[in-house]
Regions:
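A contiguous active-site-proximal alpha/beta segment in oxidoreductase catalytic domains
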Residues: 109-159
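N-terminal Rossmann-like dinucleotide-binding module
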Residues: 1-58
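Histidine-centered active-site/metal-ligand motif
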Residues: 28, 88, 134
Length: 159
């Protein structure tokens, strides 16, 4: 069983699935709950009210308002980063420092190509799996379009 920590408790972390129009799971917490191999063991947000609310709703017993404390105190295998883009680089570096094995980061890693490249290299160097959540990449429709394009039936395609 992999222990998961979620940093940032906005819509994509949890509440986006409360929309009855959504037919599939989009949130990090609910996606991890569906897996037999993962357990969300701790959550973190700067809003303590949000931490308490989601802790109660999801039966998560470990909640923090400082992600550094969570990384220091919890033995996490996977961390989902659901915070604003300008925070991603430092959080990823701190996750690496605390031996997190896999990081699932909301798009994009950074506003800076240099910072993004540095993060990719740090993850490679430290054997950390890094995935960036570009949801549409795995969407069935987009996979079909990709297959059509890669079969080269249409010649050069320009955007």
């Amino acid at each position: 069983m992999y222990n998961v920590g979620i940093i940032g408790l906005g819509q994509i972390a949890y509440s986006i699935d409360n929309d009855p129009a959504r037919k599939i799971t989009w949130s990090h917490i609910n996606a991890y709950k569906k897996s037999k191999n993962t357990q969300v063991s701790s959550i973190c947000d700067i809003d303590e009210t949000q931490v308490k609310k989601i802790s109660q709703e999801c039966d998560i017993y470990s909640g923090y308002t400082d992600y550094r404390e969570m990384l220091k105190n919890e033995d996490l295998d996977i961390v989902s980063i659901c915070t604003p883009i300008n925070t991603h680089v430092q959080i990823i570096k701190d996750c690496i420092k605390h031996n997190v094995k896999a990081i699932f980061c909301e798009k994009t890693i950074s506003y800076s190509l240099d910072d993004s490249s540095e993060i990719v290299e740090l993850c490679k160097k430290n054997n950390v799996v890094l995935a960036v959540n570009h949801v549409r990449r795995w969407d069935d429709f987009n996979q079909k379009i990709k297959n059509i394009i890669t079969q080269d039936n249409y010649g050069d395609i320009y955007t």
